[in-house]
Amino acid sequence: MNRRRPSAPAPHLETGNRGERRALEHLTGQGLELLECNFRCRAGEIDLIMRDGEVVVFVEVRVRTHPGYGGALASITPAKQRRLARAAARWLQRHRLTQRAVCRFDVVTFDGERPQWLRHAFTAPG
């Protein structure tokens, strides 16, 4: 019988998970409340969904360990922004908040050890 041992997560996934945990710590330390982690749907994925007062905040977390790949913020292309906006719309529909929700898209980047929190990083396209 051939038994497989559980494999360790890929290094880039572990880096991303660690970044999401650190971003969550930072944002909750700033007074935001966690609504959901790693929301997935056909439209895409949202790393963190938070509440900042009455505002629903969709957060993309980016970690860059090597400057040769470009900065963390530069990796959020217009196509990625569209996917995030579509996933956010699905989340709002599922929670019946489409008509009354005030939302924003934030980005937390790690180009080193310290987080950089960019509020209103982009607006939903379309």
UniProtKB/Swiss-Prot annotation:
SUPFAM superfamilies: Restriction endonuclease-like. This is UPF0102 protein Mlg_2205. Pfam families: UPF0102 (PF02021). Coiled coil: none annotated. Belongs to the UPF0102 family. PANTHER family: UPF0102 PROTEIN YRAN. One of its GO terms (molecular function) is nucleic acid binding. InterPro entries: Restrct_endonuc-II-like, tRNA_endonuc-like_dom_sf, UPF0102_YraN-like.
